[in-house]
Structure formats: structure tokens, C-alpha cells
Amino acid sequence: MATTRKDTTPDRVREETHEVVVIGAGMAGLMAATTLADRDVVVLEASDRAGGRVDTVRKGDYWINVGTQFTEGTGPLIDALHRHRVHLGTLEGKSVALSLGGKQVDTSNPFALMFRSKMTWGDRLGLAAVGTRILANVPFLEMSPDNRWANRVRAKLDNRRADFVLRGVRSELAREMVRSWSGQWMGCEPEETAATQFVFSMGILLTDPEKVDNLTLPEGGNQTLTDILAADLGDRVRLGSPVHTVEWTEDGVVVDYEDAAGPARIRARRAIVAVPADIAVKIMPGLPPDHRTAFEAIHYGRYVVVGFFTHEEGPQRWDDFLAVSTPGLSFQAVFNHAAALRRGVRKPGGALACFAGGAEADRLFELGDEEIVARFTADLLRLYPELEGKVEPGILRRHPRVVPFWAPGGRATLATLREPLGPVHLAGDYLLDMPSLADAAASGQQAAERVLASLGAR
């Protein structure tokens, strides 16, 4: 059982003792704490809400994910959704489109993309070169990691920049499209990231979403699950409790944090640190050099998101697309959160999220909220004039840190972070294969299972 010592002396720090302290209440932290629910566990979260980059706004029959867009993958995330009976809206039959020159073309149809969109022959040749370089590598990324050829290709991609797909491409349109795709799916520029993650995202998500396991939109949005997990944990999740330091010895950890009542300290046998890489470096000053180097190799995509609830009636030209790429606009993509609901008779209304990532997000960060929303609203109506008078005020989110990625060669340091630091275990979507919500959940559960094994039976 937890023990608490209260001390009202101003110069003294309140102290508690627990078996396990989890730092961070994003998907990884919540899944870790859920796995440890039968033990004496407490979760410290700096912000005023649980869920981390999972953020959903709801209204009536619709919802908008203004953080992480989709749920996909296998493992603990999908298991938890099924266990809690969260309905998963299928995206089967939905695809990604490109809006260009007033036309909307399905990107999974190469012929239509090349010849039905308004491109010059130079643009078509440039895009063909880009597509060939991406698709030639995708099959190797889909193979088992035990495959020798797959490992060779992955190693090569890990050590080259993603903008290799633009080598020799003179078409400004093709170059703009690649930057737009990189921004919308990864939140970075192609020259910032190693090619592996870029090729995977572009080659599978963009051209054939049905290849992605369990690509779904959970009913009520991605936040439905994090809300359930946080509610089940109850007051063991402490919001508004930023951690200042995590220190450890072979025998346990000491976590200094602050809450509304002032400075506080938790002593625990084990800790799970489930925060972004830069925060981990900040709160763990005693990191060994190799761990610090590995954390510093992790970069994050950044986004500006504006969500719009809409009031249209009848079938619309975006209904069959889960996303529409929009090069040339203030946002790079529109994600259609009502896509999974478009079965049978179409209900009135809708839910769209407009995204800008990478360098475009950096520029938007310099603007005020009203200016960003005004630009996105104007461009949404430019894209879909039929929505004039049917769009509610935009819901803005600024995300300076979302999808983890690595520069060429940077991912080689990741193995270091997969080993515990004595009683401190790490969790996060950066630890597994391709960063995703599913990887965050799996990482949290795996960290908790290692903690349980180290604690032994009660």
C-alpha cells in the first residue's frame, strides 16, 4: 500500500512512497499504468488532461481528431479497444486523393493520378520518378525483419535522406507534392528525415491504405480510449503535476514534482518514463552519455491543425476519401473524420481537419490564432466552395512535437533506449518499429510487463 507523509512546514517537501511511478499520461503511460493496475501505481502528468497527443473534439454525431489522426496496427491498442467495446469505424474502400488544378484524383490509381490530373509532361515525368523510387523500396519494408534483403534495403534507407526521391527531378510541382506529403504524414521536410519512415508512410498510407492493419476511426475519436483508461485509473492519474527530476539508484527512484499544493516527492521501487525525448533528457540529468545521445537523435514533426464541423446535406465529393492532399494551399491535407460513417444513407453534416506540417507549420507558428484560422477557412472554401455558409468556426491546435523521426544514421542509437536504466524503464512510440499510436500502446505495456517481472510476486 502507498504511504503518505503530510508536512505543513513551508520548507519541507511532501513525500509519498509507491511501488511504481509512471511519468506521462499519454497513450504509452496510460497503457503502462493500466497493465500495472493491480499494483501500487501512480501517474504524474504535467498538463491538465490525459491523452498526450491524442486529442478529440466532439459535437453531435461527429468528432474531429485534432491530435493523432487515425488508429492503426495490431497488439495492445487494438486489444484494448475491443476489450472496452469501442466500435471501430472501418476505412475499407476509402482512399487518399490529390487535389490539383480543381480536380480531385485518387492517388491509389496511378493512371488517373498521372493522366487525369492537370499536369504538364514534365510534371508527370517528375512524379513518375518519385513514385518509382518510393514503390521500389516499399515491398522490402513490408517483409519480415529477418529477411536478409529487407535488412539491406532498410539499412540503406536508414542512412540516406528522404529527399533522395527528388534527385534529378526538376518539376516544381513534383517537388512541392513531395514536401506536402512529408509535411502532412510526418510533420517534417524530406531533407530532415532518413528515408525509411518516409518511404513507408508514402508508399503504403498514400497509395494503398488498405494494406495498413486495422486502419480505423474509433467511434468518438481516438480520445475515446484514453478517456476510458484514465477514468479506470481514477485518482491514480494526477494532472497538473509536472516532474522536475527523476533520480535513481539500484534500489529505487526519487521523483520530484509539483502540483497545486506545491513541491512534492515520490519514492518508488520502479519508474516508467513515458514522455517525449527532449522532456526525458530534461528531467533525467543523470542520464549516461549513450542514452543522452540516443534521446538527442530523436526529432519530432510539428503540425498546425484546424478542425471544422460542417453542415452540408447529401453526398459530397470528399465522402469516399479519408484524406485529400492539397499542395499550394495554407494547409497540406484535409482529413475526413466522417469517412467511416459514410455507409448507407448519408447523415447531414461532417467533420474535417486541415493540417499543415514541417516548415509550413513553422511559419504558421509565428502567426496569431485568428490569422491561422482565417487562412485555413478561406482555403477550405477555395477547395470546396460548396461549403460556403456551412462551416462552423475553426478549432485550432498547435503541435510543436508529434511524430518522432530520425536524421540519416540517427536510428542506430535507438537500441540503447530499449534497455532499462536500473529501476527506470522507458516507454514511447519512438521505441518500436514505425512510430504510431499502436507502438506507443505496445511500448507502454511492454515496459509495465518488464517492471512486473522485476518486482516479482507480492
Residue ranges and their predicted role:
Residues A2-E15, M31, G252, W318-R458:
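Conserved flavin/dinucleotide-binding core of flavoenzymes
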Residues D61-F140, N151:
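Dinucleotide-binding Rossmann-like beta1-alpha1 core, especially the glycine-rich loop
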Residues P139-V253:
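Active-site/ligand-binding neighborhood in enzyme catalytic cores
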